[in-house]
């Protein structure tokens, strides 16, 4: 619940989508936080190269990713699912655990982990790797 309150406050004034990465140690302490935006009201894209550099330098055990939906509706889109899968693959290649993907709306936060979607996406990403 603390992270939900933090994220609701972080994104409450945002008029465009923003993406936040919270890097965690093995004992779930925050090592580093980073916020990305490209000032697009319809979505946010994360450039994988600087993002990869950041978590390569920090060397987290796990990462929580979060972004806002300025519309106020935290329901995930197909685009959100696709981005989650790409990030899950990137983290897996680097032995980093994707702890959760949170989507922040006006008053509520959607959790991929709590909804069960995260496990499905990670399994799907792992199956794709197995086929390479």
Task: Report each predicted region and the residues it spans.
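Active-site-proximal loop/helix of nucleotide/amide-processing enzymes and allied scaffolds
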Residues: 2-5, 27, 37, 41-132
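Long amphipathic N-terminal alpha/beta scaffold segment
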Residues: 1-32, 36
């Amino acid at each position: 619940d603390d992270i939900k309150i933090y994220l609701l406050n972080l994104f409450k004034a945002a008029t465009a989508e923003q993406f936040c990465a919270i890097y965690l140690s093995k004992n779930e302490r925050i090592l580093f936080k980073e916020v990305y935006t490209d000032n697009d009201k319809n979505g946010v894209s994360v450039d994988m190269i600087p993002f990869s550099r950041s978590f390569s330098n920090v060397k987290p055990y796990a990462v929580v990713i979060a972004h806002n939906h300025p519309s106020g509706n935290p329901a995930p889109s197909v685009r959100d699912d696709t981005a989650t899968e790409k990030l899950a693959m990137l983290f897996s290649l680097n032995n980093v655990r994707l702890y959760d993907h949170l989507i922040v709306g006006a008053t509520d936060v959607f959790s991929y982990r709590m909804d069960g979607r995260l496990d499905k996406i990670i399994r799907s990403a792992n199956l794709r790797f197995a086929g390479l």
